[in-house]
């Protein structure tokens, strides 16, 4: 007759098998696990380096590095780390059309481990050269037939003045005024010419700065009769 073994009895051998892997992971020492970068407007790629040293007595192998975004990649100096040796992981970030704060993660996995041994953070700030709040305004039968206000702010480090506001004058009325609070550089007041026709219009706010720097922000205007 077979006897049922206690669950604790079964889990102890399994835990014992995992101990070497856990020990190896705990003996890896990182110079840093978080890097903050502020990109320049014309910069397309940012990079961050993370160095890991094997402080244990066993050789370990990095199996893979998983990134949290298609915009983020990784370059591994070497996969096998002998005791006392180190390797470097370089995180790469491609800006594309992104703006603002981008928090990307790189998860590092060792051989025969389902869980990441470390999560590396690459926090990238991309300057918003012309910021518009809100970027979308709309009217429908349930909303008031009054103007909508959009606050425009320039990043004065790069964009020093407005150059143009492009829109269809047959569809929209746009006026400009200073922000009485001083928080924004300009307030746009937008009103459709008519509320009885459907409008899907884009307003482009353009600015310029030193060394030929140019930027624009797009506003989306909707009227649903």
Each PLM stretch: what is its role?
Residues 33, 42-49, 96-105, 143-150, ...:
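Short, solvent-exposed loop/turn segments enriched in Ser/Thr/Gly
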Residues 85-91, 148, 184-188:
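Short strand-edge motifs at loop-to-beta-strand transitions and within beta-strands
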Residues 1-4:
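Positively charged n-region of N-terminal signal peptides that target proteins for export
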Residues 18-58, 113-157, 209-225:
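Long, low-complexity ectodomains and other extracytoplasmic segments of secretory-pathway proteins
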């Amino acid at each position: 007759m077979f006897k049922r073994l206690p669950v604790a009895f079964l889990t102890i051998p399994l835990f014992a098998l995992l101990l070497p892997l856990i020990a190896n992971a705990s003996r890896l020492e990182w110079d840093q696990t978080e890097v903050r970068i502020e990109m320049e407007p014309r910069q397309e790629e940012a990079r961050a380096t993370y160095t890991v040293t094997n402080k244990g007595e066993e050789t370990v192998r990095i199996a893979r590095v998983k990134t949290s975004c298609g915009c983020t990649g990784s370059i591994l100096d070497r996969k096998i780390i002998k005791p006392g040796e180190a390797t470097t992981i370089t995180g790469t970030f491609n800006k594309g059309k992104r703006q603002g704060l981008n928090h990307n993660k790189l998860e590092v996995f060792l051989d025969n481990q389902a869980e990441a041994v470390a999560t590396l953070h690459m926090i990238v700030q991309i300057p918003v050269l012309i910021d518009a709040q809100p970027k979308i305004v709309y009217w429908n039968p349930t909303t008031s037939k009054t103007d909508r206000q959009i606050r425009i702010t320039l990043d004065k480090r790069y964009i020093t003045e407005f150059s143009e506001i492009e829109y269809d004058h047959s569809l929209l009325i746009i006026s400009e005024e200073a922000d009485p609070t001083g928080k924004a550089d300009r307030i746009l007041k937008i009103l459709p010419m008519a509320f009885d026709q459907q409008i899907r219009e884009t307003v482009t706010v353009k600015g310029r700065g030193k060394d030929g720097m140019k930027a624009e922000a797009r506003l989306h205007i909707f009227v649903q009769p």
